[in-house]
């Protein structure tokens, strides 16, 4: 099998050989530009001293580029029809393991321990994520505290904008905070829709997430912190007070007391959630947690 998978001609040849038909339900769009693959591996910072988990290898175009540079690659593929294709296209590489399964249901830490011969090496996660499942996968990896020092994803540009957003912009929201609380986020480059087969309706972007040594702000209860941030963006055009009072009805009889307490730490309830940065949300959630516990 030729190593140059990521061209229109080679991709078409592989798909015809196996009679492969794209499943819209799985959001399958295969890259057909090897230059983009090189930029992804460069952005991810892959070396022979790193292990890589890839999610959704497709027919192996990105996988082979990762294998050329990394120590070992473990790729999660949910579509069983692609397994024999991957066996064929990646047969020249002995440092790739393909795991058939849904990464959302997988014990990723167990896979790391079992599949990598040198599991102590730094781990990087790289993926061309299906649009429909982008957010659940990223949040699972963060929630499960997978020991990856960075994650590099190609995803819908709109989602990349939301992940890398700053306060007081239309893209800034609870997803921004959920990710930037743990990771530094950089939108690396835009990927035009024309370099995919089949061609999607929108452009993509590659985003690079680097794990922070410590979360961006100190919170007393992370679960409550994220509950507060989600509530604050429930209706973007409403004030903090309206959104929080809707989520926590116990605040309503004590509004004056709450306003006074929050003003003392520099937070005005007439602001909208989109104007608060992460440290301010941390102050807000820590205060609210104590306030709601008071008799």
Curated annotation (Swiss-Prot):
Protein name as catalogued: Ribosomal RNA small subunit methyltransferase A
UniProt superkingdom: Bacteria
A Pfam cross-reference name: RrnaAD
Binding site for S-adenosyl-L-methionine: 29, 31, 56, 77, 102, 128
Stated role: Specifically dimethylates two adjacent adenosines (A1518 and A1519) in the loop of a conserved hairpin near the 3'-end of 16S rRNA in the 30S particle. May play a critical role in biogenesis of 30S subunits.
Species for this entry: Listeria welshimeri serovar 6b (strain ATCC 35897 / DSM 20650 / CCUG 15529 / CIP 8149 / NCTC 11857 / SLCC 5334 / V8)
Family matches, as InterPro entries: KsgA/Erm, rRNA_Ade_diMease-like_C, rRNA_Ade_Mease_Trfase_CS, rRNA_Ade_methylase_Trfase_N, rRNA_adenine_dimethylase, SAM-dependent_MTases_sf
Reaction(s) catalysed by this chain's protein: adenosine(1518)/adenosine(1519) in 16S rRNA + 4 S-adenosyl-L-methionine = N(6)-dimethyladenosine(1518)/N(6)-dimethyladenosine(1519) in 16S rRNA + 4 S-adenosyl-L-homocysteine + 4 H(+)
GO cellular component, one term: cytosol
GO molecular function, one term: 16S rRNA (adenine(1518)-N(6)/adenine(1519)-N(6))-dimethyltransferase activity
CDD domains: AdoMet_MTases
Localisation per UniProt entry: Cytoplasm
Enzyme Commission designation: 2.1.1.182
Family membership: Belongs to the class I-like SAM-binding methyltransferase superfamily. rRNA adenine N(6)-methyltransferase family. RsmA subfamily.
The entry's keywords: Cytoplasm, Methyltransferase, RNA-binding, rRNA processing, S-adenosyl-L-methionine, Transferase
Cytoplasm found in the keyword field: yes
